[in-house]
């Protein structure tokens, strides 16, 4: 990662030190994608072992660089991970009264119109988000959504993902992908937007709830 700038020097060591210093075994950590550069699951072992070695339970969603995690292989990969790591792909779950749904989303930073391939992926990701949120029972204390891509375009205009967040009365959105440049944080239409890309958070976990 250091090829992307000096800020990334020793990033793995810094993340580990900061994570280990504040996360307790009973905590749950939401990790919003781009876990490994590997193409195949077998080649991602070292990166996944690194995440597994950190304290706490972890919930992972796919990022745009996670080629090792193909959507149709989610169950197979999950079966080979430790119990402390949960792959969340278009599903919803409840942790200590808090509902969590997650999916990758789709690209937003390009000015050109989406082509047919983009439209297909976009519709699928929207369906995953809708499904995941629908699996969260009504009586939860709050609803958190994990996305890799943010739910707005390069002009900071909300897209169809944001509409789903509003319709399901999501309380908190955590997202990644953005490294500098455009971003939205804080109260957006009653939803607390949190950008959690590690270079934005100082390579340290941030408390969500």
PLM features per residue range, with description:
Residues 13-17, 94-96, 117-123, 134, ...:
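Binuclear metal-dependent phosphoesterase catalytic core
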Residues 1-57, 67-68, 122-141:
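N-terminal active-site segment of His-dependent metallophosphoesterases
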Residues 42-49, 74-78, 156-166:
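Charged helix-capping and loop-helix junction motifs
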Residues 36-42, 64-72, 94, 107-111, ...:
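Active-site environment of divalent metal-dependent phosphoester hydrolases
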Residues 22, 66-156:
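Conserved catalytic scaffold of divalent metal-dependent phosphoesterases
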Residues 49-55, 81, 163-169, 187-188:
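Short, conserved loop/helix-junction motifs that constitute active-site signature segments
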Residues 29-34, 58-64, 86-90, 144-147, ...:
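Active-site neighborhood of phospho(di)ester-bond hydrolases with catalytic His/Asp-centered motifs
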């Amino acid at each position: 990662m250091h090829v992307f700038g000096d800020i990334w020097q020793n990033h793995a060591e810094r993340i580990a030190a900061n994570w280990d210093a504040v996360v307790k075994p009973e905590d749950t950590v939401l990790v919003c994608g781009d876990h490994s550069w590997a193409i195949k699951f077998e080649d991602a072992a070292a990166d996944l072992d690194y995440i597994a070695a950190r304290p706490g339970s972890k919930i992972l969603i796919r990022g745009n660089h996670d080629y090792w995690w193909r959507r149709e292989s989610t169950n197979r990969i999950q079966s080979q991970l430790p119990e402390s790591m949960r792959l969340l792909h278009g599903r919803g779950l409840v942790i200590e009264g808090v509902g969590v749904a997650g999916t990758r989303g789709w690209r937003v930073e390009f000015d050109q119109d989406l082509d047919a391939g983009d439209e297909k992926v976009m519709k699928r990701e929207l369906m995953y988000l809708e499904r995941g949120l629908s699996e969260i029972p009504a009586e939860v204390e709050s609803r958190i959504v994990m996305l890799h891509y943010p739910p707005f375009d390069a002009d900071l205009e909300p897209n169809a993902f944001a509409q789903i967040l509003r319709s399901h009365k999501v309380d908190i959105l955590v997202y990644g992908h953005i490294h500098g440049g455009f971003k939205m944080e804080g109260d957006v239409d009653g939803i607390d937007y949190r950008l959690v890309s590690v270079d934005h958070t100082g390579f340290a976990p941030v408390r969500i709830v």
